[in-house]
A protein has these predicted regions:
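Hydrophobic alpha-helical
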Residues: 84, 90-112, 194, 216-299
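Hydrophobic alpha-helical segments within soluble ligand-binding/sensing domains
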Residues: 70, 136-170, 189, 231-238, ...
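Extracytoplasmic "Venus flytrap"
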Residues: 27-46, 50-51, 58-76, 80-82, ...
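Hinge/cleft segment of the Venus flytrap/periplasmic-binding protein
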Residues: 26, 169-174, 178-182, 186, ...
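Beta-alpha junction/loop-to-helix N-cap segments that form part of ligand/metal-binding clefts
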Residues: 64-126, 138-141, 261-264
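Short, solvent-exposed amphipathic alpha-helices that sit
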Residues: 39-54, 146-150, 185-212, 233, ...
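Flexible loop/hinge segments that line or gate small-molecule binding clefts
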Residues: 101-145, 164-172, 295-303, 307
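Sec-dependent signal peptide cleavage junction
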Residues: 18-26
Length: 361
């Protein structure tokens, strides 16, 4: 079994290197928003293996966060004979772009499987798109749940450790929120509910709501201006914050909430450089840092007591659902045949992969 898995993974890695090649006749084309996203990298590894296990030959292509590149590459793949097109849309929420791609794929009468990045901010609009082509499906999450679960986790942790987190003893907990992308549906929901649900837990227990560290910031978040949810953005922001907001000045940021684990990593690196959140958590002040995805890097940080918690976005589950549905559509089966019963099929066109809390315990 181990030898088989090793062969599958080796094959998958080889296939994933075909990122500059258009799909040939009978190959399954997977178009990625970017190869630079940590979570999507884990999905890609799992998806290549899952597709290979189903007998599909995969061509992965990096769109480098450029929608025109993605559109052009998909059109080329269709011309060269791809047997299915799997799309991780660059322009999340752009229904016009999704319609253009769907129409091109539909014209070739091959399966169109979109995943992870929403095609519209309007669920009814998305439903109409996918119901308009029987060989299509969307695999994602109930995007509000990550923020809700994160917010509840944050709120309970703060409540349980209130006095030790209140570094300046003003009776309130100051926080910073790092947002991955200004327009992305999931980023918007995580930013909203990550704080609102924490506040619900705190106020229900008679504690004040969280207070954004910078009263002049009306948005109450700092966003990656490149929309790439990157650790570079959060690192730079956190370094700048610590120069002015620190224990010496009596206004230290006491809580860090991030839209994803990569941004949590950047914040922790900046905190560590300033003497906080050191490996092991001994002999230093540890500022609670929360993320989403439960990446391997985040799990290691949590084990090292440098990070507090994350919400697991199941990369293997996402890959399994995409591979199962794609193979079913290629073979002319019911698209949801053999799908893991833990996945939620909604309205005949979309599948939600569940989230879970991860604290390392």
């Amino acid at each position: 079994m181990k030898k088989f898995v090793s062969k599958v993974l080796a094959g998958a890695l080889g296939l994933s290197m075909l990122c500059g090649v258009a799909a040939a006749e009978g190959e399954t084309y997977v178009s990625w928003y970017t190869f630079g996203d940590v979570y999507l990298s884990s999905v890609r590894t799992a998806l290549d293996a899952a597709m290979e296990a189903k007998g599909l030959t995969v061509v992965d292509k990096d769109s480098n966060a450029n929608q025109q590149t993605q559109t052009d590459d998909i059109n080329t793949a269709l011309v060269t004979g791809a047997n299915a097109v799997v799309v991780n849309l660059v322009e999340s929420g752009a229904i016009g772009t999704a319609e253009t791609l769907m129409n091109a794929i539909k014209e070739k009468d091959v399966p169109a499987v979109f995943f992870n990045r929403a095609v519209s901010t309007d669920n009814a609009e998305a439903a109409e798109l996918f119901k308009g082509y029987e060989k299509s499906a969307f695999i994602g999450t109930d995007f509000t749940q990550a923020g809700i679960m994160q917010g509840k986790m944050v709120g309970q942790y703060v409540l349980d450790h209130y006095d030790e987190l209140d570094l300046n003893k003003d009776g309130k907990i100051s926080y910073v929120m790092f947002k991955g992308d200004e327009a992305n549906q999931e980023a918007i929901a995580r930013t909203k509910y990550g704080v609102e649900c924490a506040d619900e837990v705190l106020t229900a227990a008679g504690k004040p709501a969280l207070e954004f560290y910078d009263a002049s910031n009306a948005n109450k978040y700092l966003v990656d201006l490149n929309g790439t949810w990157s650790n570079t953005a959060s690192f730079d922001y956190m370094q700048t914050i610590l120069a002015q907001y620190n224990e010496a000045n009596g206004n230290m940021v006491e809580l860090v909430i991030c839209n994803n684990d990569d941004m949590a990593l950047g914040a922790i690196n900046a905190l560590s450089n300033a003497g906080y959140n050191l490996a092991g958590g001994e002999g230093c002040t540890v500022i609670p840092v929360f993320g989403v995805d439960a990446t391997e890097a985040a799990k290691e940080l949590i084990a090292n007591k440098q990070m507090t918690g994350s919400i697991k976005q199941d990369a293997e589950g996402m890959a399994d659902a995409v591979a199962t549905i794609t193979a079913n559509l290629i073979e002319g089966k019911d698209k949801f045949e053999g799908l893991n019963e833990n996945y939620e099929v909604v309205d005949g066109w979309t599948v939600n992969i569940p989230y879970s809390v991860y604290t390392g315990e």
